């Protein structure tokens, strides 16, 4: 299943070339990521005060420019879950379903109190896998 977040393009997102600046896409991905975790894990779990998912790496590909008057949305999907990390794929589309940009993010489970990585809580894996029917559990493949 795909999670969708509508994004409002703001005037200050636009650069001198008349399109959304490449740095602004990360705000769009962040907004969609927060919405995903709030919707899938629930507000209590997604407050991330004790346990969190932090970004370890991001790869963004810019496919086509986005302009001020475009109507865009971001799709978010977790494709794999390991013991301590997960992989998230996000895509920006316009109203005509044209792919504008993609992002692959690896996130790591983290204990705020211990200031160290932890295993992804089982309750998170359960909630994510109930939404993402085809998520791959990498740690099961390694066994």
Residue ranges and their predicted role:
Residues 1-73, 81-143:
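Terminal targeting signals and extreme-terminal segments of soluble enzymes
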């Amino acid at each position: 299943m795909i999670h969708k977040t509508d994004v409002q393009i703001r005037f200050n997102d636009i650069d001198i070339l008349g399109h959304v600046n490449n740095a602004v896409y990360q705000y769009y991905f962040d907004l969609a990521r927060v919405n995903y975790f709030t919707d899938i894990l629930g507000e209590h779990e997604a407050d991330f005060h004790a346990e969190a998912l932090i970004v370890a790496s991001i790869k963004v590909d810019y496919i086509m420019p986005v302009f001020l008057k475009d109507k865009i949305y971001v799709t978010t999907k977790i494709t794999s879950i390991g013991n301590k990390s997960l992989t998230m794929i996000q895509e920006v589309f316009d109203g005509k379903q044209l792919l504008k940009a993609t992002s692959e993010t690896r996130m790591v489970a983290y204990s705020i109190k211990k200031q160290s990585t932890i295993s992804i809580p089982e309750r998170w894996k359960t909630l994510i896998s109930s939404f993402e029917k085809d998520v791959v559990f990498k740690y099961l493949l390694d066994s």
